[in-house]
Amino acid sequence: MKTVLQKDIVETFKKLNDTLSSFSEEEINTVPFQGSWTPGQVVQHIILGNSGYPELFEGKTKATIRKYDEHVKELESIFLNFNTKMDAPDFLKPEMKNYNKNSLTLALLKIESDLLKASENYDLTLTCLDFQVPGFENFTIYEWINFALVHSQRHTHQLQKISHYITTL
């Protein structure tokens, strides 16, 4: 379980970092079309949504009385359905400002490192009690890491579409 999860973490963040590196410093802060976030804002949203996991995993947990990965397929079906538009909750909406590509890259590397360490050092079957995604019961550590992955994959896809749009302007 841990080896496969760690491979998924590395692959997800490699694709995300490769996509981010394809943007110039100027393109990072370019609004591709009306109503869209800039690539920098998309990455900042990923950072906001995928930060704080070590603290969550260190918080209150309990033994899980269901399958530890019960919600993974549902999360995949929601987040990897690219035909569905979602609205971020206010606390995950990125500020409209100029973002620095290097700072974003460093923040993503820290998140990748945090997730890899968590996947190695924690009992992934424990249920976290300190935070809950609306509409779901409390997630296990395994499900939280998968949430971070499908969230990142969704927005990597969004960044690839923005890149295509910007380069064809």
Residue ranges and their predicted role:
Residues 15, 110, 114-117, 154, ...:
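Residues on one face of amphipathic alpha-helical coiled coils
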Residues 75-126:
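Acidic/histidine-rich alpha-helical segments that form the ligand environment
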Residues 29-79, 121-169:
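Short, contiguous alpha-helical
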Residues 26-27, 88-96, 132-135:
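A short small-residue
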Residues 1, 9-46:
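Long, hydrophobic N-terminal alpha-helical segment
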